[in-house]
């Protein structure tokens, strides 16, 4: 069986969790490789909703292993809370199901304080951070002063590092006009306890995954956020603090690029974005509100209403290119039911010219207006449909047009919130 990477092809919130949950039955191991608990996966199985922020979606499948790689930043309070909630639901019966990298960096209280203080200091220039300390934790990682999961397992080492790093954090917060109220001995005690709680799951993930591959096991890499939020390839600076594209899948868990056989991009049938930054197809009218209401477009992590708009083919084609997408899974196709017409942005108008590729400068993107192609809508409900041929002709025509514009095949469509409400045209794990 091949190894498959699943990444967001838009601005995040594309429904990756549902698709990963669906594909997990074909994989042996699900791997999370970047981001932190700023991402939220909402899964609906048998009508029961589960929201996960750190642990991979595949944990709801008995017998599957889930790995949190070195590229993820971990809030140990959140990790332990998710473990406890899953156990209370009857999931994670076998502790061997969850594997956590010893080298994953740890979100500390000062990271959250710095995150919030900086955002407040930016005023109208706010990026729209979740305030969960993700960015400052990645900064400390790059500056070679971060704490890792392995540091929580040695209380003396933890105490030394907390003392050093807390002093630096207080200095930075003072410059921002904020204070860090911290009882260092109590903090060390608490995080050492958290370390003991996760110690049984922590290991060298690179070795663990390499052995899994040697045993012939198949891997499913689960991305967080989306392509347009990638720190290098997104609409910088309105991005997240990690690489969200497929190339980071192996870097974030300690494998080489030859471990990947197929890259699946997830895209909504329309588009959404959370936080600031350019968004050419944004709808600030009744249509945008209608998409938000029908699609339930509120953040799984923050509860913030998402910005909504029509599908942007230029952004999608960009995602195909920078990820090397093998195929696309389209989610929330059912949300478009009932619209008289549906639109796709096929170009940008800028200074009297029409562009057919997304500019690399976000300030230029901000000045662009979309050139739309309109297609007839459909009125039929889609939730009960399970095959491609069952879809209404106009819905099929819409999907095929997206396929033509993106340049890769749409291999699946989500027609409802539940795991089973999905049409899989081509299974990435069976593709050759």
Swiss-Prot record:
Keywords: Cytoplasm, GTP-binding, Ligase, Magnesium, Metal-binding, Nucleotide-binding, Purine biosynthesis
A Gene Ontology term for the protein's cellular component: cytoplasm
Coiled coil region boundaries: none
Superkingdom of source: Bacteria
UniProt: substrate binding residues: 300-306
GO biological process, alphabetically ordered: 'de novo' AMP biosynthetic process; IMP metabolic process
Enzyme Commission number(s) from the entry: 6.3.4.4
Cysteine disulfide partners in this protein: none
Subcellular localization, as worded in the UniProt entry: Cytoplasm
Chain sites annotated for binding IMP: 13-16, 38-41, 130, 144, 225, 240, 304
Needed cofactors: Mg(2+)
Pathway connected to this protein: Purine metabolism; AMP biosynthesis via de novo pathway; AMP from IMP: step 1/2
Function: Plays an important role in the de novo pathway of purine nucleotide biosynthesis. Catalyzes the first committed step in the biosynthesis of AMP from IMP.
Protein's name according to its UniProt entry: Adenylosuccinate synthetase
Organism: Anaeromyxobacter dehalogenans (strain 2CP-C)
